[in-house]
Amino acid sequence: MRSRSGSGVRLDRILFMVEQTICSHQNPITALFANQKDFPGHAWVRDNVYIAQALWALYRAYMKCADFDEDLTKAKELGFTCVKMMQSILECLMRQAEKVELFKKYQRPLDALHSKFAVGTKGTVCGDADWGHLQMDAISLYLLTLAQITASGLQVVRNFDEVAFIQNLVYYIETGYRTPDYGVWERGDKTNQGIRELNASSIGMVKAALQALNDVGDLFVDGSRGSVVHVLPDEIEQCSAVLSSMLPRESFSKETDAALLGIISYPAFCVEDPELVSQTRETITQRLLGKYGCRRFMRDGYKTVLEDASRLYYNKSELQQFEDIECEWPIFLCYLILDAMYSKDDDAVEAYWRQLESVLVLSDKGFRLVPELYVVLKEHVSAEKAHPGTQDRVPGGATPFLWAQSLYVIICLLYEGFLLPAELDPLSRRLSVYEKRPPCEVQVTVLAESLDVQRELRAHDIHVQCVDEIDPVFTILPASALGQLLAKIGESKKLNLSGRPLDRPIGLLSTSRLYQIGNKFVIFTPQFMDSRRSHLMYDIRILTDEWSSELQYIYASWNSVSISGRPLVVLVITQGMLSTEGLSHFSNIHLNRHMKSTVIGAIKKINTGYLSGARVVMKDLSDFFRTTAVSKMEFRDKSAEDTLRSVAAEKVQFTLLTEDATEAKNEKITTPRGPRTLRRGESVKDRSAYTAVHKASMRHRSIALDSNDADLMKLRLAYKSRPRDLQDMDSTYQSPPPTQTPLGLVKEHSSGELRQQLLKTTRRGAENETTHRDLTAEQMNEMKADDLLDLVNETTVLEEQISIVHCLWMKFGPDYDTELGCQHITVRMLMEEVHTKACEAREWALVRLTAGLLKKQLEELSKAVTHLLVRQKQITVGIASKKEEVITCPKTNEELEKIMNRAYGDDANSFTLAQEIIVYLGSLVRTEPKLFLEMFRLRIGLIIQVLASELSRLRNISGAEAAETLLTVSPFELKSMIFSLLSGRLLEEYAEDGIHYSDTIRETRTGIGSFRRQIEERKSLRKSTRSVGGLEIPKEEDEDEEADEDDFQFGIWLRHRRIDGALNRVPNGFYAILWDTVHKMPHGVKINDTVLHWGLTQEMTRKEIKFALESEEALNRIAEPEYRELVVETLWLLGRLEKLVLLEQPNIPRDRPLDVDHILHVANQIFVDHNKHLETIVMECCASSNPNNTRCDGARNICKHFYDSAPAGEYGTSHYIIRALMQLYS
């Protein structure tokens, strides 16, 4: 008889260890495992999947190293056991199919699949609300393992019902990048309060599962197309973007977490950036690694001797007591060994192996067991806290801990050479971090909607095919049609499962490939090309800007989602994009010509081969057939051709309807908005009646920024320029027409001039209002519905029509039946019609008013909110510091509608304007994330105020006029202004021709951010501009100072501070430094009557996002953004002056909080006294000894010239703040 080889004996020894330490816990009927003494009979999905991985690894080792037939028998037995386990877990999940259907639609925690089941029955073991079941990582880990096992040749999925369920699990997890869950540790945030969070470890596992299922092909392992699972690449890319913004942080409450080891290495391998992988690994080893393993996260009280086991929740103040005595988990040494093996770091493998060997526990039979954790004994707590890492610990929890024991089996197989790391990764996921493919060129096909469009493009030397001219094998449909097709994939009548929810957006990457459906190849146009999605698409410049940014996005993202073939984007040019006449009787012909040139210019740029840094190729559709990515769609129980025909019959129209087309359509009636009922005539003849109607309408049109708004007064940007005669200015100035760009006229004015002009406008408005109020109110009360309807039938002027319909809306309500033309025509139908007219005419003020009254929600809003939130940018809507609604987690369209109604219920214009701004911010945070690096909360109300304030400064107009002008700005110009503010550029420097994004954003941060740049010190220029009795007092200056004076612009730093304050921008690392400051102050820090207590540092760690949000909450109570920014500068300097704080006896207040406002006022007084000594321009306001001179109008009694000082330099604000701090500490 042939003896066994040495390797065979060692492999048998590992198998025997598995049988004795792992398989002894297995239920013989269900093949599931239970391992928790506190929960007997409970089988956790996560634990069982890792056990399946260990059995699968042992199966592969025996298949590879078999000496005899009996070894193959052992291999088959291990393979069958592994498959049975995976099938049992699948059966447990399929018994809750109704939960999958509900969760797809609503993402409610109580609809989540359970995370543990009964070992013996595969049923549930607790109620929906009795456990933190929503664990995206557990379901994703199962799908990832299923894909890897299937790729190795073992078949787990047995029938098409199971395939449909797996497809629905994909729909279940694909929103994981925006779904807060309870995380790997099942208890939510670290206070154990049951608060769900976005967890990086969950998002990483979701991404890995989606990629693996996308790569595995068919689930039957036989090449059958019907068992293919479809994954949308956009969801993978969303996960990548969120991970990049979160790592090495785990969540809001956890700076980092050892669970991240599972996503940067085995088993997920979901992070492609090697620098980010290295940074995450180093963060974990530096902060969490100890002698016995890693702590799960900082201040983790689980199973420590100080934890009160009778309470599930912790008190916030007790978290600090767990610091330095957190339990250490040996399982993470296994993860570190696996990571070192896959990264081929032999030294690290040996070091971690020796460390792991030292913490293993020997069983009675001599087997090495991995305990769950190591605990500090109660008598050693004080010593451990005094000298972390010096005290011995004892094993705690389950021994062996099956999750850890399974990983130990895997590393034993790898360490002893039975398997290579690649053999546990048949999908080659590990290579993504090492193999970098260059960006893939984007293929673009431009098609003309009609022959007329084709001829017009040809006249500009652009040769494209018409839609009707493409090869019959191709079919072109809008993105919404793809959504309908996906809704049919995954359907199962037996399981009562539908396909993908129709309300989920279709991403750009998904529409950038060909789909083979039967004998047809279908191309879907991008979703932003679907017409009539919102009024934004009527601004063609927004559409062409979308072309640029989205093509750049495809160029940068395509290779990261592992799709074979190149992307293809089809753009359909419609008549509405080029026509200079006929869109509407109200159209702005000049604007239409500009639109036409914009579209043609964009196409010519695409044809050059480069667009915004992206490599693009423009050809006919048939030329790209062989190189384009193709995905095949098949439908169970249905003909592919029949399915395609049913969807194509419902397809959305591409074109923006012309007036004639709209008229023809309405003759046939009935559109959702009703028939066109406003007859053609002339202007209203009864001007007196119309005046009353118009004034009533105008009183309800203003946004929250009118001339009496205190916040706008505070936001007024004061500039000092050449003296001007106020009367002349008032008599000669004329407000520019609303259609002119807000960036056109640049004028400068002083604070006093602006305030006097603002007050004059207010007085004139008040006088006019008083004169006409009684008459207008009386006329309106006497008017009946028939009177207003007679007026609306007389006019063809859009402004007049909207004013009259607006009054009908306010007086009789939207559902009032006007009975126009003896038909059922409600006021809402009339409003829908004038809204469409306003869109066609590109009258943006009227568009926003009518859209707000109709409560129209932009389709892009929900997606934009999600883009911001998953990148940790919270949003507030409403009037700043008065009535703000905070959005902290992704919302459904219905929830967003309620929030917007609460915030802007009576303000139709702001209702629309705020949505537009959120959409633009959501677009920019995706394409230009560096613009948002220093922000945690975006306050839409303050952004609106700053935009209006900038327009007031640029055009030298009043607050009311600035608010009106802001409403007339086109969507593209509004996006340009927001981009300009975010990038720190001056609006007057900004060209209106386009948004020119750069591949890398220069660091042009303003305000306190300038401390990161070298700022040249220079003497105060205020000396040379001080006047006495109207005469300039010359000062002796050298030539360099005179040159500086020419360049100096008064008001520039005041403006920067207001913009930074409005955007909530802070320096990098600001909140960590603030944490240090609060931690050193016994009674905390007082900001604007709000105290950041010392106890916050006991509850939250230094770099915890929750602390940043608490601090942000205090700062946001400051109404004046420029004062907020000075407070930020003071706190920043206070935290940086470590030598002062570390004095032996610093004069820190021991009986009260440190008052930041007091420090600022002391610094201001030092500034005033210093400038009084220097006899600068401050002598004319705050430093004046003349009782007739009043103090300046700076916020919070701080001199406006102090606000207008640079942060650094001999005469900068930091100089005076430091002197004030010296007085405090000395």
Curated annotation (Swiss-Prot):
Pfam family, any one: KPBB_C
Residue ranges, annotated region (Disordered): 666-688
Any one Gene Ontology BP term: glycogen metabolic process
Gene3D superfamilies the record matches: 1.50.10.10
Pathway membership: Glycan biosynthesis; glycogen metabolism
Keyword set, alphabetical order: Calmodulin-binding, Carbohydrate metabolism, Glycogen metabolism
Compositional bias annotation for Basic and acidic residues: 679-688
GO MF: calmodulin binding
InterPro entries: 6-hairpin_glycosidase_sf (IPR008928), 6hp_glycosidase-like_sf (IPR012341), GH15-like (IPR011613), KPBA/B_C (IPR045583), PHK_A/B_su (IPR008734)
Protein family: Belongs to the phosphorylase b kinase regulatory chain family.
Function: Phosphorylase b kinase catalyzes the phosphorylation of serine in certain substrates, including troponin I. The alpha chain may bind calmodulin.
Name under which the protein is recorded: Probable phosphorylase b kinase regulatory subunit alpha
Organism for this UniProt entry: Caenorhabditis elegans
